[in-house]
Design a protein with these regions (language model features):
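Aromatic-rich transmembrane-lumenal/periplasmic boundary elements in polytopic membrane proteins
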Residues: 175, 179, 259-365
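Internal alpha-helical transmembrane segments
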Residues: 143-153, 157-163, 174-183, 207-284, ...
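Hydrophobic alpha-helical membrane-insertion segments
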Residues: 92-101, 163-186, 259-270, 463-480
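Membrane-interfacial loop-to-helix junctions in multi-pass inner-membrane proteins
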Residues: 75-93, 119-125, 129, 149-167, ...
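Membrane-interface helix-loop-helix modules in multi-pass inner-membrane proteins
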Residues: 94-164, 181, 482-485
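Membrane-interface interhelical loops and short amphipathic "cap" helices
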Residues: 31-49, 76-83, 107-129, 181-217, ...
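C-terminal substrate/ligand-recognition segments
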Residues: 414-477, 505-533
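Individual transmembrane alpha-helix segments
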Residues: 45, 210-223, 311-432, 511
Length: 556
């Protein structure tokens, strides 16, 4: 059977084996799920979470470097050049580690998720290809000019190189999140029963997908916050030690100002993401809120509680009236559907999906499109959007058309993701976000009053706050990706269908290998970062440009 499956993959018919052939494939889905599916998900989660330790800092530091160097070019003050070089060194260390950990991410689609790659490769691969050709090469080309062009380029020329690095970093995030946003809201595409694949029908719709755009601005804003808190904390450490005081004060001022603006934007853009999720991923919102029953509008927000998924209730729940209704619907009259109602809707979708599945079998059996009765085509067209729900039954039965009512109910219940981890991951993320607004706001006020070094206890808080934006970012990733389960493509392709036919021992071995390698890389990153921070900024002997008469005091 392994040889047969391999030949089907080579012939480009992997999905046909899953959608058409009764017998073996269904059996393997049921038997493999606990090992291959879970292990493949675990491997992707581990590598993604490791990679995302480096991405936010790269996004944010690239912009902060552009700001600092712009001030240097405009004022000619040597300390701003020194700041740009120092923080640029830390950016370079992080950038290299981000590239090293990111390469594996794309290979996994072919290694562990070959069915997924075959099914949607034409759509998902396009943004990733553009990212590599446009954004990554832009970033990789100009990052060399940033580090080695200080004495070879003019001020403005080097500044343009720095801007190009920042643009490349953010363009990379844009294209990757366009691909991810399509997985969350698969617009501009349709299933072709002749090729058994998803195909692009409107690339502009994929590009302008509102979910993708909201994810992009929310994610890059989170990266700006991460870099701001990093610069804030390191600068606070310098002030506590009495080292590089002038550089630290200016860096802290930039970080507090930029961080406050970014923190506020994260909240606003996160609200937009929540609103769009309630439109396109209602189950995710219901699970985040542990909303078991549909509440009368406007729904309340559960601040605290212990969700019990088995009993479908939340113990010791503390609610704030109206808040969730305003966030999720932006109205006082529109209800937010609860988990139980959504499960019932999923059961109806599964039954409609079975109708589409049956029509697809007839279309494929006819061989020639012209030989397919029009009424069969119409039935498939009317119900094809639900065919992914029929594939949820592959866990329990070889042929979804043979599913019992109990199996359909069980598959409908599978559409509920893990409520407890989602509930708390979201609240940890939000709690940290509001704390960082308070922290950056406090230092913004202290900076305006020129009292940055007056309160050592606040500086210590800033130092200890350095890990917080990373924790919030990882929690956000969990909310976005774990909340999409059981779908690898929302409503289209279940996660259990997307995996490759690998042995569990093979996947487990690669997990252990990746964990070992990534842990070593993380330790190297931390060691290099700490060494560079302890060494401090290098003295810059280049004469400072004279842009104003000596009688005019330059701005701090």
């Amino acid at each position: 059977m392994r040889v047969l499956r391999s030949r089907r993959i080579q012939n480009g018919a992997a999905l046909e084996a899953l959608l058409i052939t009764p017998g073996g494939p269904g059996y393997r889905l049921k038997e493999m799920e606990l090992d291959i599916v879970s292990l493949s998900r675990l491997q992707f989660a581990i590598t993604a979470l490791y990679h995302f330790l480096f991405v936010p800092l790269t996004l944010g530091l690239s912009v902060l470097l552009a700001i600092m160097e712009t001030v240097y070019v405009m004022t000619g003050r040597l300390i701003w050049r020194q700041m740009t070089k120092f923080w640029g060194t830390l950016f370079g260390i992080n950038f290299v580690m981000g590239v090293a950990t990111g390469i594996v991410m794309e290979f996994q689609f072919g290694m562990n998720w070959s069915y997924y790659s075959h099914y949607v490769g034409d759509i998902f691969g396009a943004p990733l290809a553009i990212e590599g050709l446009m954004a990554f090469f832009l970033e990789a080309t100009f990052v060399g000019l940033f580090f080695f062009g200080w004495d070879r380029l003019s001020k403005v020329g080097h500044l343009m190189a720095t801007y190009a690095v920042a643009a490349g970093s953010n363009f990379s995030a844009l294209w990757i999140l366009i691909a991810n946003g399509w997985m969350q809201n698969p617009v501009g595409s349709a299933f072709n029963p002749e090729t058994m694949r998803m195909e692009i029908t409107d690339f502009f719709a994929v590009l302008m997908n509102p979910v993708a755009q909201a994810k992009f601005v929310h994610t890059v804003s989170a990266g700006y916050v991460t870099a701001s808190i990093f610069v804030l904390g390191v600068s606070a450490w310098y002030l506590l030690k009495g080292r590089s005081v002038e550089l630290a004060k200016r860096s802290l001022t930039i970080a507090a100002s930029f961080g406050l603006a970014a923190s506020l934007s994260v909240v606003v853009l996160g609200d937009e993401s929540g609103y769009l999720a309630n439109e396109h991923q209602k189950m995710k919102i219901a699970a985040i809120e542990a909303m078991w029953e549909t509440e009368p509008a406007p729904a309340s927000f559960t601040v605290f509680g212990f969700p019990d998924q088995a009993a479908r209730e939340t113990h010791f729940a503390v609610h704030i009236p109206w808040v969730m209704g305003l966030i999720g619907t932006r109205s006082l009259t529109t209800p937010i559907q609860g988990i139980n109602d959504l499960v019932q809707s999923a059961e109806n979708h599964i039954r409609n999906g079975i109708v589409a599945y049956d029509a697809l079998q007839k279309i494929r059996a006819a061989g020639d499109t012209n030989a397919v009765p029009q009424e069969v085509k119409d039935v498939f067209a009317d119900n094809s959007q639900w065919m992914g729900y029929a594939l949820l039954l592959k866990r329990y039965v070889d042929d979804p058309r043979q599913a019992t009512d109990a199996q359909i109910t069980q598959a409908a219940n599978d559409t509920v993701p893990g409520v407890l981890p989602l509930f708390w991951a979201f609240r940890i993320m939000v709690g940290i976000g509001f704390f960082l607004i308070l922290l950056t706001g406090t230092f913004f006020v202290l900076s305006a009053r020129r009292k940055l070094d007056r309160y050592p206890f606040l500086l210590r808080i800033a130092v200890f706050a350095i890990p917080l934006p990373w924790i919030a970012a990882e929690m956000g990733w969990i909310v976005a990706e774990f909340g999409r389960q059981p779908w690898v493509i929302e409503g289209i392709l279940p996660t259990a269908v997307g995996v490759s036919n690998l042995g569990a021992s093979t996947v487990l071995l690669t997990i252990l290998g990746f964990v070992a390698i990534y842990t070593v890389l993380f330790i190297i990153e931390m060691g290099l970062m700490i060494r560079a921070i302890k060494a401090g900024p290098e003295p810059d002997s280049k004469p400072e440009a004279i842009l104003a008469p000596a009688s005019i005091a330059p701005a701090e």
